[in-house]
Structure formats: structure tokens, C-alpha cells
Amino acid sequence: SSQAKYLLSNWKEIYQNAPGLGKAENCIGGFTFQWSDGWWKTGQTTNLDKHDSTASWSNGGYRYDFVKGQNNMNEEWFGVTSKRPTNTDRTYSVNPRAAFYLLQEVHKINPYKKNRTPENLNDEFSKIKLNEALEKAKLNLR
């Protein structure tokens, strides 16, 4: 999942730039956007119970699907959990995506651990396996 790869890379960079780890040492944390898909993002007040697939803006930072002159960003799909179809009471259940499971592992890492070095931080990140997160996420779709 592109989302999982980007989030893993973002959090690794955040932790590498924590005070005392030799890089910029100017980072005290970060924020993951967003918890669940935002089905209201396309149309704002229409199709609120539908997961639209329309990209509404373009960002060249995502090379996997960027084509110059075409939109590739759809915020309805930004959640680390996906929404299931609307329930009869107009609420949603959610399914954790691979990014959710990767973030669980990322947030077990303490960048301020005693004797933390850039090397052992990288070692901890290398233990996080995208394939395992993808498999867990697939189980939620059954």
C-alpha cells in the first residue's frame, strides 16, 4: 500500500530528527492524517454514504500515480481505516488498513530510549514488515 509506505517513511524521518539522534534534532513529534476515510470530501454535501473515486487535486510528491496535468489525490481515501457501507442507523464500521498496522509497530519505538543511536533506531524500523501489515489488513475484508 502506498499509504503505508509513505507513513512508515514519514515516521522514520520524524524519529531520526528527534533531539540527540544526530540529524536536524528539531522534531518533537508528528501527526497522522486521518483516522477514517472522509466520504464527505468529494461534493461536500452529496454522496455522503458513497465512497467516491474522483481525484480532486494533483500532487507530484506521490510518484506512484502522478501524471502531469491530471488529478491524483482523493482525500476520501486518506484514512488509516476504511469505512464499510453505511449502516441502517447512518453510522459506519471501519476496517484497519495496512497503514494502521504499520503505525502500531512504529509507535512501539521510543526515539528517546536510553542509549538510542541512529543505527539501532534504523534496526528497529527495519523490523517493521509491510507484507505482514498487508496480510492483516486483508483479513479485515473477509
Model-flagged regions — what are they?
Residues 21, 25-142:
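Aromatic-rich peripheral "rim/lid" segments of glycoside hydrolase catalytic domains that contact
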Residues 1-16:
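Extracellular glycoside hydrolase catalytic/binding regions
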